[in-house]
């Protein structure tokens, strides 16, 4: 029987732990984690995401502020702002909402963020730490949230399982593969140039799709009893749908995340978690004592 992995419910539980951690920092250390989100331009989807992040942060007791800049903001001006936030010791976490306008190089912006305040975990130092060790303190939000969902369904021991990641982006695909490799899974990372993707996915115990194509994954991609994590968020006829054709694969899988209420809430929860971790790092506090129950699954 197919079971839904309810990311909304699981994320709510994580956020309860984070709220407790924030209260702990305030009471015992006199600290309030602070997050600054920068958005450039008026991309409607980005505005929705930023509002969701700020609302969630505020609900957990985090000091959150969105800095909205006009779309003609120059790259130099944006880097200057990031540097000012880097230098401000009262700011613990910095996020620059992507995508940026075409005239701004996102790589330069990401590299300008202090790696200890990089809650997206996109900075090359944090990417390198993730590649080197399972014990990297900061992990990218969507892949880390997806891994948490996988473990919630299958248990903490994923050793020996075959996993296929569809999509090789720096944001989801590559770090997702790295996290699963640290769990001793055997990884196949597929992409737009991969031949016969279905042949790869049909061998997998775990399939993670982050390709951004509505209903790309059909039942002929999936072996019976597989676990499917749908990272895709696509608009079709005004409705939010995933990369996975949910109804088509539903009777074939053992576990699956819905869209919405799957990976999306986990991404925001792990952004909040990273904000608490960066606060602990900058203040030389033992983060595991503050948020140990969440960290155990990572």
From Swiss-Prot:
Domain of life per record: Bacteria
Residues reported in the UniProt entry to bind NADP(+): 167-169, 192
Signal peptide residues on this chain, from the entry's feature table: none
Pathway, per record: One-carbon metabolism; tetrahydrofolate interconversion
Keyword Lyase: no
A Gene Ontology molecular function term of the record: methylenetetrahydrofolate dehydrogenase (NADP+) activity
UniProt-listed GO biological process terms: L-histidine biosynthetic process; methionine biosynthetic process; purine nucleotide biosynthetic process; tetrahydrofolate interconversion
Disulfide partners: none
One cellular-component annotation, GO: cytosol
Pfam families on file: THF_DHG_CYH (PF00763), THF_DHG_CYH_C (PF02882)
Keyword RNA-binding: no
Catalytic reaction equation(s): (6R)-5,10-methylene-5,6,7,8-tetrahydrofolate + NADP(+) = (6R)-5,10-methenyltetrahydrofolate + NADPH; (6R)-5,10-methenyltetrahydrofolate + H2O = (6R)-10-formyltetrahydrofolate + H(+)
EC id: 1.5.1.5, 3.5.4.9
Keyword vocabulary terms for this entry: Amino-acid biosynthesis, Histidine biosynthesis, Hydrolase, Methionine biosynthesis, Multifunctional enzyme, NADP, One-carbon metabolism, Oxidoreductase, Purine biosynthesis
Quaternary data: Homodimer.
Stated role: Catalyzes the oxidation of 5,10-methylenetetrahydrofolate to 5,10-methenyltetrahydrofolate and then the hydrolysis of 5,10-methenyltetrahydrofolate to 10-formyltetrahydrofolate.
Family, similarity comment: Belongs to the tetrahydrofolate dehydrogenase/cyclohydrolase family.
Name of the molecule in the record: Bifunctional protein FolD
Gene that encodes it: folD
């Amino acid at each position: 029987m197919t079971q839904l992995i309810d990311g909304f419910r699981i994320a709510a539980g994580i956020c309860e732990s984070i709220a407790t951690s924030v209260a702990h920092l305030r009471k015992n250390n006199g600290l309030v984690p602070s997050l600054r989100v920068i958005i450039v331009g008026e991309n409607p989807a980005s505005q929705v995401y930023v509002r969701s992040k700020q609302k969630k942060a505020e609900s957990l007791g985090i000091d959150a502020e969105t800095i909205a800049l006009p779309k003609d903001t120059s790259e130099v001006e944006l880097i200057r702002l990031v540097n000012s936030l880097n230098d401000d010791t009262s700011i613990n976490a910095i996020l620059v909402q992507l995508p940026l306008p075409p005239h701004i190089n996102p790589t330069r912006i990401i590299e300008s963020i202090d790696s200890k305040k990089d809650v997206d975990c996109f900075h090359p130092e944090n990417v390198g730490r993730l590649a080197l060790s399972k014990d990297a303190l900061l992990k990218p939000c969507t892949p880390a949230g997806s891994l948490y969902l996988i473990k919630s369904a299958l248990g903490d021991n994923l050793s020996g399982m075959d996993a296929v990641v569809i999509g090789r982006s720096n944001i989801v695909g590559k770090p997702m593969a790295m996290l699963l490799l640290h769990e001793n899974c055997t990884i196949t990372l597929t992409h737009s140039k991969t031949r016969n993707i279905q042949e790869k996915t049909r061998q997998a115990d775990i399939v993670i799709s982050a390709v951004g194509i509505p209903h790309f994954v059909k039942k002929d991609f999936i072996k019976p009893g597989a676990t499917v994590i749908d990272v895709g968020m696509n608009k079709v006829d005004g409705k939010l749908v995933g990369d996975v054709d949910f109804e088509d694969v539903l009777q074939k899988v053992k576990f699956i995340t819905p869209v919405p209420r799957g990976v999306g809430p986990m991404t925001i929860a792990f952004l909040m978690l990273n904000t608490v971790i960066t606060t602990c790092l900058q203040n030389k506090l033992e983060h595991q004592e503050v948020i140990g129950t969440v960290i155990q699954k990572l």
